[in-house]
Amino acid sequence: MERGLWRAGSVPGHVRLAFGRTGEGPEPLLALHGITAQHRAFNAVARHLRHPDGMVALDLRGRGDSEKPPPGNYGLDAHARDAIRTLDHLGLERGILVGHSMGAFVALQAALLHPDRVRALVLLDGGWPRPEEASDADEAAIQEGLERAFGRLDMVFETPEDYLDFWFPDQNLTLEDLPPDLADYYFYDLARVDGGFVPKAFREAAEEDAGSVFSESPTAAELEGVGCPVALVRAAEGFFPGTDPLISDEARDVMAQALDLRSERLLSEANHYTMLLLEEYARQTASVIRDFLRRLG
């Protein structure tokens, strides 16, 4: 199901990284997806954004069509190095990084470790400060949300429609029933194997990365070391409808104090996933990014 939005490319090296690219310009945005996703999560945002230089959306190591090294090769530092390696491959001295969910933490880590290489950051419902002492309730809420996403990674689905039934139970959907951007996202998420289809994301990679986010992401004090301009887009709901947002108002205030926050928006009816995957919210997300880029000049 190739829709023509992305041109496939790869970053060579000790871990080969796959990416999709839109546009032809010399300074594309670099987009980094969430913990079990892949670059097609940015389908709708990239299409609505129409950035003049385009977008390069990476399949993080262990996801999509990128290589999947064994456990011990993941974590925020490894992904941040991959982001910089991608900038090198693209010939970009300094890049604008757009990160959703875990991708936002990767973008922050890249800005902290390589401040001379990151011009600006767009954080999409991720990158909140790691508390000095995490509460059991907060960790449990995030773990509960991740469990559903992680659970599918060990499953074999007889058909793509069975995969849709996992996400949309009892709706009997086919790929043709979904908006094209969303259908393409779910189809690309699958690899064909004997007996059916499996999600491309490597579970051990996701688990290692979750541990890295919980234990190694920046604290509020460390966020103050990010020297570049930042845009923040938050979803009003968490992983599921009716759940608390992942970035609370209190966490947002801490981020606003620590970071050079130039643009922000709260998507009032979106959740952590729909802010990218559903048309109406992806359009709003793209609008914030466009406004932020205009302000950067």
PLM-predicted stretches and their roles:
Residues 256-269:
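Catalytic histidine neighborhood in serine/cysteine hydrolases
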Residues 191-258:
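Conserved serine/cysteine hydrolase catalytic core
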Residues 20-68:
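Conserved HGGG/HGGXW glycine-rich cap/lid loop of the alpha/beta-hydrolase fold
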Residues 93-136:
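Conserved hydrolase catalytic core segment
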Residues 56, 60-98, 270:
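Active-site loop/oxyanion-hole signature of alpha/beta-hydrolase fold enzymes
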Residues 12-22:
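A short loop-to-beta-strand scaffold at the N-terminal edge of the catalytic core in hydrolase folds
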Residues 131-200, 206-217:
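Helix-rich cap/lid subdomain of alpha/beta-hydrolase
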